[in-house]
From Swiss-Prot:
Cofactor(s) needed: thiamine diphosphate
Molecular function via GO: oxoglutarate dehydrogenase (succinyl-transferring) activity; thiamine pyrophosphate binding
Family, per entry: Belongs to the alpha-ketoglutarate dehydrogenase family.
Annotated GO CC locations: cytosol; oxoglutarate dehydrogenase complex
Organism: Geobacillus sp. (strain WCH70)
Function of the protein: E1 component of the 2-oxoglutarate dehydrogenase (OGDH) complex which catalyzes the decarboxylation of 2-oxoglutarate, the first step in the conversion of 2-oxoglutarate to succinyl-CoA and CO(2).
Top-level taxon of origin: Bacteria
Protein name: 2-oxoglutarate dehydrogenase E1 component
Annotated keywords: Glycolysis, Oxidoreductase, Thiamine pyrophosphate
Disulfide bonds: none
Any one Gene Ontology BP term: tricarboxylic acid cycle
EC number: 1.2.4.2
């Protein structure tokens, strides 16, 4: 075989796509004039002959090999140019076929075929007939006999009811796998007649359900699926693959559009239960054994199209799989990272020390997006960015864009700057399939390809399901007023069930009478279910109080640890491998921790934290901590991950505790707040036994995730009964660093505090931090569990007055309030009680150490702000019979911090005729001064006012 005959040798394997086309053009030029090309190319052509096509390099089938052995590239420049053109045409069809595809069920978009016309490449059908199939479409089925057949085959595949975009996928193995699957038709379902009838039955159930709701509950919001009915069989197909592959958990996130239909038909929520929610009747009687979620009794509940559900399925091997539809607020797309967190938690085994073991095949996420929200909401890009990061990847998610080509009343030309709703995914190299929702079999094909790709490559996949919205945004909306052109077409357009039924009738697969009987059966089932729902609303009790265990205080949890245990753990945490080179300065800092259990110094904040973590792991509670720069700590205080200064190798001391009984991980998060916090919330919901902590770089940046605090963390239990023990660490304190590096917006968390929905604390000592972390770990699996919002310090991290003696760890516990030592000892003389919290308490303590004659003053630190320590403060006030004023002192402006929250509570419990007043910054629009000099003067003024006795 000469070099001119086809072979698989280098160097041509490094060329593909447009680059290969260029090299083939150069070869054509070389045949005419060898000296007209670059000397390097000339040498390659001389040595290796004609460039090999991608087809040759990646198809090793017997027929293709035979072609390569028998076909010799022509040296005639004209014939060779036709081959080059044919290869280019095939490539253009793969890249641009989607522009000409029949993917819009309303046919309202012009198809662009310019890039894939034969005339554009100076080709004729006769030219193509002379070219072997393998050069154009090596994966073509047997009926494709020549180049013309191959081009027609590619046109059919790439411009039909399903279209593909994968040129953004840079990995050659992935691209060629996609080409193989698509062009061979391997992914497309070959349904039996029985399966086609079953598919029609499913579409009949989907449509019948919506029509029944429309007739029965006139004008009530339901956000129907109509126009995207095929989404349900598409989900069915993904679920079928999952149970066959013995996946353990499938987690679904979606907004309101079509949610009730998915709840009924994918999650198995009984019709009766859904109808009861429309009827405002009791729905508890219809709770299935699988555990579908209804309105949560004892709380405020949520609207029916926000509720989630869970269902368990079994396959023939008795393998059980759990399907979960996440509870969801109306805030579009914000559930996405929550569902990813669910999935990572479901994939991991946290029962052993070290890093959790992860099995990405055991669970995956399906995210259903809106076509306006997918490009419009920034949380989408944030979440996509998590998909391949070590601390967040889940082995790929399947995204379905429920594309009805409109957002409320806004059409696509006003809602995005891209051609497709899915285009943002291209930046993450995610393959995209556009599919016409009026072709249910094509929708199943898209599901097959997505599942197979995710399984093989552990990466995300996007299905752009293009349909329409048969009615308005909700059932009280009239779309003809704002979108008359689109809706005049929709009103005349048959439903997907009607289209598919007609197709099966025409093929003789089913009779018209059988179709009508199918409709009657579905309608009868719905009617019977509706008749079971009670109609009398008068029996319902609308007084909804939280359950008693939650309404009460947190239970006592022993958080002190024996000194010998702490001493041993401390020693183990300071042991490194003999060949590990710790950074010199850091090594000196860590060495200081060695002597604290021998009376040499105190335990500072970061030291208390790592000891708390070590003891929690010893108790068998897994820990997951994430945040921006959290491994080291924003303020270089933590150092949970050490780096060898010669090799860069990492060492995590908490992985080497001798009696650790659970996993520990700490990840530096991407520069994202909302998606990461949502992810950690989701992780904690699915792994309730795990102490999950999220740390803001500065508390000021937590408001980038405000939607997560508002819609999930503070209210998730009241709306959905969804428990969480998530810990949020928000660095807070005024140190002259300006308005964006001073405030964790404490006031916002206190404003949201109600029904014991979380604990809000602002601590002043390392021991308090130790105990509150251990208390939180101790309540994780109790009914009283709740999130913990901690205003963490910056300047206190190394402050000697915030450090704690060993005895406070071995004999102490968490105290909601702490009285200032050395003050208030002469009870008769105390006239002023100052209440304060957090870092400002240390500012006052520092100044007090320089003063004398303070027997008229007492200072009380309120460490736990919510729940408010009413009884503890009342007991303190009662000890001082001559107190004249109770002052709340803070460094935050009057309209921020704790004052607005504590004022009415203090007035309620203050002794009669005792004035309650405020000292701090005046009301401000911005949290803090930008000038450090101005800050210092203002800070000094507040401290002086607080510590200066009033003149008589």
């Amino acid at each position: 075989m000469t070099k001119q005959t086809m072979n698989y040798a280098e160097p041509w394997s490094q060329f593909y796509g447009p680059n290969l086309g260029y090299v083939m053009e150069m070869y054509e030029q070389y045949l005419e004039d060898p000296d007209s090309v670059d000397p390097e190319l000339k040498q390659l052509f001389k040595e290796w002959g004609a460039p090999t096509t991608e087809a040759e390099r990646f198809d090793h089938s017997e027929s293709a090999a035979k072609t390569y052995q028998t076909f010799r590239l022509p040296e005639n420049p004209t014939i060779f140019s036709k081959l080059v053109a044919a290869v280019k045409l095939a490539d253009k069809i793969r890249h641009y076929g989607h522009l000409a595809a029949d993917i819009n069920p309303l046919n309202t978009q012009n198809k662009d075929t310019r890039r894939i016309e034969l005339s554009e490449f100076d080709l004729t059908e006769d030219d193509l007939k002379q070219i072997p199939v393998a050069f154009i479409c090596p994966h073509a089925p047997a009926h494709v006999k020549n180049g013309l057949d191959a081009i027609n085959h590619l046109r059919k595949i790439y411009t039909d009811k399903i279209a593909f975009e994968f040129s953004q996928v840079h990995n050659l193995e992935e691209r060629n796998w996609l080409i193989s699957q698509i062009e061979s038709g391997a992914y497309y379902p070959s349904l039996t007649n029985e399966e086609k009838v079953a598919l029609l039955r499913r579409l009949t159930e989907v449509e019948g359900f919506e029509k029944f709701l429309h007739r029965t509950f006139v004008g009530q919001k339901r956000f129907s699926i109509e126009g995207l009915d095929s989404m349900v069989p598409l989900l069915d197909e993904l679920i079928r693959h999952s149970i066959e592959e013995e996946v353990k958990a499938v987690n679904i996130g979606m907004a309101h559009r079509g949610r009730l239909n998915v709840l009924a038909h994918v999650l198995g929520k009984p019709y009766e239960m859904i109808f009861a929610e429309f009827q405002h009747a009791e729905s508890k009687d219809f709770m299935p054994s699988e555990g579908s979620v209804a309105i949560t009794y004892g709380w405020t509940g949520d609207v029916k199209y926000h509720l989630g559900a869970a269902r368990r399925l079994r396959n023939k091997n008795e393998h059980t799989m759990r399907i979960t539809l996440a509870n969801n607020p109306s805030h579009l797309e914000v559930v996405n990272p929550v569902v990813l967190g669910f999935t990572r938690a479901a994939q991991e085994d946290r029962s052993n020390a070290g890093v959790p073991s992860q099995d990405t095949d055991s669970a995956f996420a399906i995210m259903i997006h809106g076509d306006a929200a997918f490009p419009g909401q920034g949380i989408v890009a944030e979440t996509l960015n998590l998909s391949r990061l070590q601390g967040y990847q889940t082995g790929g998610s399947i995204h379905i864009i429920a594309n009805n080509m409109i957002g409320f009343t806004t059409e696509s030309y006003d809602s995005r700057s891209t051609k497709y709703a899915s285009d943002i995914a291209k930046g993450f190299e995610i393959p995209i399939v556009h599919v016409n929702a009026d072709d249910p079999e094509a929708c199943l094909a898209a599901a097959n390809l997505a599942f197979a790709y995710r399984k093989r490559f552990k990466k995300d996949f996007v299905i752009d399901l293009i349909g329409y919205r048969r009615f308005g945004h909700n059932e009280m909306d009239e779309p003809m007023a704002t979108n008359p052109t689109m809706y005049s077409i929709i009103q005349q357009h048959p439903t997907v069930r009607q289209l598919y039924a007609q197709k099966l009738i025409e093929k003789g697969i089913i009779t018209k009478e059988a179709v009508e009987e199918m409709e009657r059966e579905v309608a009868e089932r719905l009617k019977i279910a509706y008749e079971k729902v009670p109609k009398d609303e008068s029996k319902l009790d609308f007084i909804m109080d939280p359950p008693k265990p939650v309404a009460s205080k947190l239970p006592f949890v022993k958080t002190s640890v024996e000194k010998d245990v702490l001493r041993r753990l401390n020693k183990e945490l300071l042991q490194f491998p003999s060949d590990f080179h710790v950074f010199n300065k850091l090594e000196r800092i860590l060495k200081r921790r060695e002597g604290v259990f021998d009376g040499k110094g105190k335990i500072d904040w970061a030291h208390a934290e790592i000891l708390a973590f070590a003891t929690i792991l010893r108790d068998g509670v897994p820990i997951r901590l994430t945040g921006q720069d959290s491994q080291r700590g924003t303020f270089a205080q933590r150092h949970l991950v050490l780096h060898d200064m010669k090799t860069g190798e990492e060492f995590v001391p908490l992985h080497h505790i001798s009696d650790a009984n659970a996993s520990f991980v700490v990840y530096n998060s991407p520069l994202t707040e909302a998606a990461v916090l949502g992810y950690e919330y989701g992780y904690n919901v699915f792994a309730p036994e795990t102490l999950v902590l999220w740390e803001a770089q500065f508390g000021d940046f937590a408001n980038m995730a405000q939607v997560m605090f508002d819609q999930f963390i503070s209210s998730g239990r009241a709306k959905w009964g969804q428990k969480s023990g998530l810990v949020m660490l928000l660095p807070h304190g005024y140190e002259g660093q300006g308005p964006e590096h001073s405030s964790g917006r404490l006031e916002r968390f206190l404003q949201l505090a109600a029904e014991n929905n979380w604990t809000v604390a602002n601590l002043s000592t390392a021991a308090q931090y130790f105990h509150i972390l251990r208390r939180q770990a101790g309540i994780l699996q109790r009914e009283e569990v709740r999130p913990l919002v901690l205003m963490t310090p910056k300047s206190l991290l190394r402050h000697p007055l915030a450090a704690s003696d060993v005895e406070e760890f071995t004999n102490g516990q968490f105290h909601p309030v702490i009285e200032q030592k050395g003050l208030g000892e002469n009870r008769e003389k105390v006239e002023r009680i100052i209440l304060c919290t957090g870092k400002f308490a240390i500012d006052l303590a520092e100044q007090i150490n320089k003063m004398e004659g303070l027997d008229w003053l007492h200072i009380v630190r309120v460490e736990e702000l919510y729940p408010f320590p009413k009884e503890e403060l009342q007991a303190i006030f009662a000890r001082y019979p001559n107190v004249k004023e109770i002052i709340w002192a803070q460094e935050e402006p009057k309209n921020m911090g704790s004052w607005c929250y504590v004022e009415p509570k203090l007035r309620e419990i203050a002794p009669d005729e005792v004035d309650v007043s405020y000292i701090g910054r005046r009301r401000r629009a911005s949290p803090a001064e930008g000038d450090p000099v101005v800050h210092r003067k203002e800070q000094e003024r507040i401290i002086q006012c607080a510590l200066t006795k009033k003149e008589q």
